Amino acid sequence: MAAQDPQNQKRRDHNVWSLPQRKASRRLPRKENSWDEFRRVIPLVPLHPRPALDVAPPKVAVLMCTMQGQRFLAEQLNSIATQTHPNWEIWASDDGSDDHTHSILEYYQEHWGEDRMSIHAGPAEGSTANFLSLTCRADINTEFFAYADQDDIWEADKLERAVKWLQTVPRHIPALYGSRTQLVDERNQYIGYSPLFTRSPSFGNALVQNVAGGNTMVFNRAARDLLRRAGDQVQVVAHDWWAYQVISGCGGRVHYDAYPTVRYRQHDDNQVGANISLGARLVRLRLLLKGRFRKWTDQNIQALMSIKPLLTDENRSVLDEFAASRNGSMLQRVWGLWDSGLYRQTVVGNVALVLGALLRKI
């Protein structure tokens, strides 16, 4: 059951998301079991027939990267199977799992068919490289593309909402959809929500912050073609942040949906968590002071410089001014942020941004 649409609500705090209590998910075993034992507890959801071609909505390629994902993969696959937008196909890229991840993918492929699920070997160079490699595959030919992690749960209308907005954008314009997320624990029990962002997405925001998690992102073919031109060998911090930077920087359109379309599972094996607690924020502050964010910015700027001809004239100027000001005096560093129009989505985030500039940590 999807979350209640916040567009019909008047309040904008965390209490706006009034959801019914969800039944706890049945986790698949964490310890190693034989495949026969493991398969017996997989709650596979059968598919509805694919729509007839003369009435079929546009096809979405679901780009899913996996690595040691046996605990939650089946639940994620089932949530894709129950989408109200029925025309999708999964391209799964496994980075060398030695648990039952690959067997689970093959099990679903056997029941759903190869036209719904194709399985490929990833580059085994980490999650970011795996997603970039999958994004740049020339043999994926659909109108829309959606990133998918291996351990989340999609709300039933996730693809429908994304495609509805993407279809308002002319096909030749790169377009990226992302949304807020609901946070759940290992058993799919409510924890909270990701921060609600209210400022418009832009390249000035993308240079210093990612506006939406990759697990919510859906984009059109023009955006995918742009990411392919950037290539899969760029050294970037994260594939989703990179997508936001490239698409906004090259004049594309980016839409942030305040409605949470994904239940973002928080667990010990997460490579990246939501980081909304006070403790997590203190950790981020410590990383900022230790120079981690500056290293990330170095990496992203270097990658953006490699595609500089693709950026709009205005955004090339923004990139140049930001890159130059980072190595200037204290006044130049702060002025560079202001003059180039860089911002984060929250007051606290902007305070941290200015602090980082003052301390030469951005």
Spans of features found by a protein language model:
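Charged/polar low-complexity intrinsically disordered segments
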Residues: 4-9, 23, 31-32
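Leucine-biased recognition of intrinsically disordered, low-complexity hydrophobic segments
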Residues: 19, 28, 44-47
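Nucleotide-sugar donor-binding/catalytic module of glycosyltransferases
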Residues: 38-278, 358-361
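C-terminal subregions of glycosyltransferases and related glycan-biosynthesis enzymes
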Residues: 50, 228-232, 236, 242, ...
